[in-house]
């Protein structure tokens, strides 16, 4: 549909689920081999020429190996480059094991001015996030999974530009903010809490550090007890973002449910349960914090 779109691959076309694109549009695909820094450099050059390049690979390889290039050659120059970091978190890195699970990427990218961060909650939302990223100017980082995550959204639901979608509105005992592929678990936890007489609001945050957090602030104002759940290190992810908004706008208690250690190899769903992301564990943490 657009002649300006380019896909830049550091030997990661399969990981990005972009093999059909490379085969159908060979003139819009550049293979750089296992050279993440080079891939970002190439993308920066293409963006300087007016094209819209997408660079994708495992999120840790992208944000750690090419950190300087993402910062200086794209962020500092505010170039129109889009990044897709796949296999994010415990739920995204099942097949390759602990060396390919990454839960620090949001902390890294959130330190770069000019970047917008998209955190889709399921494969369909990832598709719509890519479409939206192509239509906005400036650097965008999309935190993607493996394509094996639980479907929550309707497949035709657009990626919310407001940065938030409220899924459950049971009450104001607490607000549960979800981020990424734990959304189905957070919604199940909200249902469990309702059965126990604790009425919460549950929402999906799909844009971090966006330019207009007004809709997020409205939902934050529903309760003085805010909980964040994200498949990321406890530092620099959703918890840090909501804490910042609370400190700067409307103080409230923020309880962060996130990773505090490195992960381990194993089936993604079992790991998520083991590291505190089961609906039962989330609900128990809310009950404990509320003293109920």
Segments from the language model and where they lie:
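Thiamine diphosphate
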Residues: 1-143, 145-292
């Amino acid at each position: 549909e657009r002649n300006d779109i380019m896909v830049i691959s550091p030997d990661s076309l399969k990981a990005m689920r972009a093999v059909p694109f490379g085969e159908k549009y060979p003139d819009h695909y550049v293979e750089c081999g296992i050279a993440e820094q080079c891939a970002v450099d190439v993308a920066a050059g293409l963006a300087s020429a007016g094209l819209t390049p997408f660079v994708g690979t495992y999120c840790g390889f992208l944000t750690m190996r090419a950190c300087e290039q993402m910062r200086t050659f794209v962020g500092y120059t505010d170039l129109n480059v889009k990044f897709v970091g796949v296999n994010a978190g415990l739920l995204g890195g099942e097949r390759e094991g602990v060396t390919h699970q990454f839960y620090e990427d949001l902390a890294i990218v959130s330190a770069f001015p000019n970047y917008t961060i998209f955190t889709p909650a399921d494969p369909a939302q990832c598709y719509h996030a890519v479409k939206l990223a192509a239509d906005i100017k400036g650097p965008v980082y999309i935190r993607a999974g493996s394509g094996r995550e639980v479907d929550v959204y309707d497949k035709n639901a657009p990626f919310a530009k407001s940065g938030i979608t409220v899924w459950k509105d049971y009450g104001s005992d607490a607000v549960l903010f979800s981020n990424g592929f734990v959304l189905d678990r957070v919604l199940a936890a909200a249902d469990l809490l309702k059965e126990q007489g604790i009425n919460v609001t549950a929402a999906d945050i799909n844009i971090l550090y966006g330019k207009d957090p007004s809709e997020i602030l409205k939902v934050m104002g529903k309760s003085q007890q805010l909980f964040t759940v994200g498949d990321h290190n406890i530092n620099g992810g959703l918890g840090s973002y909501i804490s910042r908004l609370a400190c700067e706008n409307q103080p409230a208690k923020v309880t962060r449910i996130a990773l505090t250690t490195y992960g381990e190899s194993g089936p993604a769903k079992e790991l998520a349960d083991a590291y505190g992301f089961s609906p039962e564990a989330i609900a128990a943490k809310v009950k404990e914090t509320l003293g109920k």
